[in-house]
From Swiss-Prot:
Family: Belongs to the universal ribosomal protein uL2 family.
Annotated compartments: Plastid, Chloroplast
UniProt region (Disordered), positions on chain: 1-24, 224-254
Taxonomy, superkingdom: Eukaryota
Gene3D superfamilies per the UniProt record, alphabetical: 2.30.30.30, Nucleic acid-binding proteins (2.40.50.140), Ribosomal protein L2, domain 3 (4.10.950.10)
Matches recorded under Pfam families: Ribosomal_L2, Ribosomal_L2_C
Xref: InterPro entries: NA-bd_OB-fold, Rib_uL2_dom2, Ribosomal_uL2, Ribosomal_uL2_bac/org-type, Ribosomal_uL2_C, Ribosomal_uL2_CS, Ribosomal_uL2_dom3, Ribosomal_uL2_RNA-bd_dom
HAMAP family with a match to the protein in the record: Ribosomal_uL2_B
Assembly, per entry: Part of the 50S ribosomal subunit.
Name of protein: Large ribosomal subunit protein uL2cz/uL2cy
Organism, scientific name: Nymphaea alba (White water-lily)
GO cellular component: chloroplast; mitochondrial large ribosomal subunit
């Protein structure tokens, strides 16, 4: 990803480092409007997810996570910005006339050819079952359930690694450090998701954050005791507790949020870092 730095003409642009990917008009038949209801509120209008609200209107791009155009080669026509994710997307024109969006693989350029199916070449952007991939292959957009479409390693710069195959299962090391089992019949895309430098962007000003639908975050230590467990005290005071807590008194850092005794625990060989 190319990072664009502005001239230091104003305080808001002095520290801004934004994505220079050009915005383009998406294909009309592959988009639809979405009603972003609530924006952090429930049906009664009560805040259930803090720091959300506002933001620019978005059109949702239909992304082909299934890659079910089997054994039909396609050509990358455009590489586009998608407001609904931090990864880029690219428009594919297939040989049978079908046009679809997929996640942009790192290093893919306009004019490259991709294909999905069984026994296809192990090259960037191709999608095939895990059983046909050699060990050590870098992959993304990985299926958990056969035919459901890719669900793992879809964020910008995400990449997983195929480290073992035994019986009906394949062992993957995910970007989070988790090691888990997946059916060998599930499909994945070869390569890494593009826009690797997405986490290096610096918006530079609060207004850019507001466009993304993210509201300001207030520290609990500057609140009153009635509003937050960290609040209160004379002047600048510490939180007054051994460990940080949420506004509702639960442990804030290091607490495991995964559901206990979840059905998929048997497939996880090593928990994420």
């Amino acid at each position: 990803m190319a990072i664009h730095l502005y001239k230091t003409s104003t305080p808001s642009t002095r520290k801004g480092a934004v994505d220079s990917q050009a915005k383009s008009n998406p294909r009309t038949k592959l988009i639809y409007g979405q009603h972003r209801c609530g924006k952090g509120r429930n049906a009664r209008g009560i805040i259930t997810a803090r720091h959300r609200g506002g933001g620019h209107k978005r059109l949702y791009r239909k992304i082909d996570f299934r890659r079910n155009e089997k054994d039909i080669s396609g050509r990358i026509v455009t590489i586009e910005y998608d407001p609904n994710r931090n990864a880029y997307i690219c428009l594919i024109h297939y040989g049978d006339g079908e046009k679809r969006y997929i996640l942009h693989p790192r290093g893919a350029i306009i004019g490259d050819t991709i294909v999905s199916g069984t026994e296809v070449p192990i090259s960037m952007g191709n999608a095939l079952p895990l059983t046909d991939m050699p060990l050590g292959t870098a992959i993304h957009n990985i299926e958990i359930t056969l035919g459901k479409g890719g669900q793992l390693a879809r964020a910008a710069g995400a990449v997983a690694k195929l480290i073992a195959k035994e019986g009906k299962s394949a062992t993957l090391r995910l970007p989070s450090g988790e090691v888990r089992l997946i059916s060998k019949n599930c499909s994945a895309t070869v390569g890494q998701v593009g826009n690797v430098g997405a986490n290096q962007k610096s918006l530079g000003r609060a207004g850019s954050k507001c466009w993304l639908g993210k509201r300001p975050v207030v520290r609990g230590v500057v609140m009153n005791p009635v509003d937050h467990p960290h609040g209160g005290g004379e002047g600048r005071a510490p939180i007054g507790r051994k460990k940080p807590t949420t506004p509702w008194g639960y442990p804030a850092l290091g607490r495991r949020s995964r559901k206990r005794n979840k059905y998929s625990d048997i497939f996880i060989l090593r928990r994420r870092k």
